[in-house]
């Protein structure tokens, strides 16, 4: 997919969703061929080659079993890979995804004309210092995002690839249908889709959920293809995805507390039970003190306590805090 990992882990991150979802997990991201730090001169952009990109990254990272999280244009490659490698993909999350591109949905003449107009505007205006043409894409995909968020996304995309390659990515996904592959996906799958999605119709999300056996479907309020932080659906999809990915994680269900804690929350509570304060916990885990506080709030909620002392009592009653950091 079109991405720029180097930029996305800086202070001006345009798409913070994945980092939020992957907290306390290993997150592997990559720049697809034709974008980011990968070969920008690569011309043969297709869903098949996007699948090959994904396979190469998986092998290079030494991943034996893992979860795939994808959105929008990356969903087709994720579906294809998961169907072909059921022994490696444990879970899959698709946000604003689809199996069939526009040209496989019996588009009207108006829809085709609108697509061609937008693609022409993107290619011609991609390098303009004024982002008007690039904003056409963001306005259709993220109509609820703030102007600041939209501008940040256009800046990230412009720094990532060329207008020509962007158009190639759009054409590749709009002319591809992976519905048959979706039927062969075997892993548990969560599909989240905005009810009023301006880019990918809600019906396409529902259809995809019907194709993948036993998929879970999460309808989201709003119009953004993928919710941005200013959208209330952002927190909904982050929390739902975390819960979906953590189901069955060792140390969560069997912690003796009778509640489901994330791995990071479990670490924080263990250190609290050992008597460490927030500053000491932050140093031990390599986090900021603010991040530690942000973990403690949901711990209190899950334990149904209103202060640190009561949380520590519950933790020690469950056998936590016996080790020393």
Regions found by a protein language model. Give the residues of each.
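Flexible "cap/lid" loop of the alpha/beta hydrolase fold
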Residues: 79, 83-84, 89-124
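Helix-turn-helix DNA-binding segment
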Residues: 251-297, 302, 313, 317-325
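Catalytic active-site module of serine/aspartate enzymes centered on a nucleophile-bearing elbow/loop
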Residues: 215-260
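Conserved acidic catalytic loop of the alpha/beta-hydrolase fold
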Residues: 48-66
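Conserved HGGG/HGGXW glycine-rich cap/lid loop of the alpha/beta-hydrolase fold
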Residues: 1-39
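Conserved alpha/beta-hydrolase "acid-adjacent" motif
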Residues: 198-204
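Conserved alpha/beta-hydrolase catalytic His-Asp/Glu region
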Residues: 126-172, 181
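Short beta-strand/loop motif that positions the catalytic acidic residue
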Residues: 185, 191-193
């Amino acid at each position: 997919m079109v991405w720029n990992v180097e930029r996305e882990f800086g202070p001006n991150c345009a798409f913070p969703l994945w980092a939020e979802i992957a907290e306390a997990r290993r997150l592997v991201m990559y720049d697809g061929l034709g974008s980011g730090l990968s070969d920008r001169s690569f011309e043969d952009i297709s869903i098949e080659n996007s699948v090959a990109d994904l396979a190469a990254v998986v092998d290079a990272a030494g991943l034996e079993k893992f979860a795939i999280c994808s959105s929008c244009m990356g969903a087709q490659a994720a579906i294809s890979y998961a169907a072909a490698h059921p022994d490696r993909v444990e879970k899959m999350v698709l946000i604003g995804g689809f199996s069939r591109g526009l040209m496989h949905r019996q588009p009207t003449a108006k829809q085709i004309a609108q697509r061609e107009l937008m693609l022409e505007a993107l290619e011609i205006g991609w390098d303009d210092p004024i982002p008007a043409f690039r904003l056409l894409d963001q306005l259709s995909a993220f109509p609820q995002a703030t102007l600041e968020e939209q501008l940040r996304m256009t800046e990230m995309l412009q720094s990532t690839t060329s207008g020509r390659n962007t158009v190639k990515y759009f054409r590749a996904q709009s002319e591809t249908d992976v519905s048959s592959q979706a039927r062969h996906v075997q892993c548990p799958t969560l599909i989240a889709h905005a009810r009023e999605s301006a880019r990918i119709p809600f019906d396409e999300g529902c259809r995809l959920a019907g194709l993948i056996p036993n998929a879970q479907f999460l309808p989201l309020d709003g119009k953004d293809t993928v919710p941005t932080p200013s959208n209330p659906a952002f927190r909904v999809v982050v929390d739902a995805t975390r819960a979906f990915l953590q189901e069955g994680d060792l140390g969560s269900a069997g912690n003796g507390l009778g509640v489901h804690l994330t791995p990071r929350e479990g670490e924080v509570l263990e250190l609290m039970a050992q008597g460490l304060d927030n500053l000491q916990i932050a140093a031990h885990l390599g986090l900021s003190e603010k991040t530690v506080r942000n973990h403690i709030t949901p711990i209190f909620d899950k334990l149904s306590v209103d202060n640190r002392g009561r949380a520590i009592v519950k933790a020690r009653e469950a056998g936590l805090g016996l080790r020393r950091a």
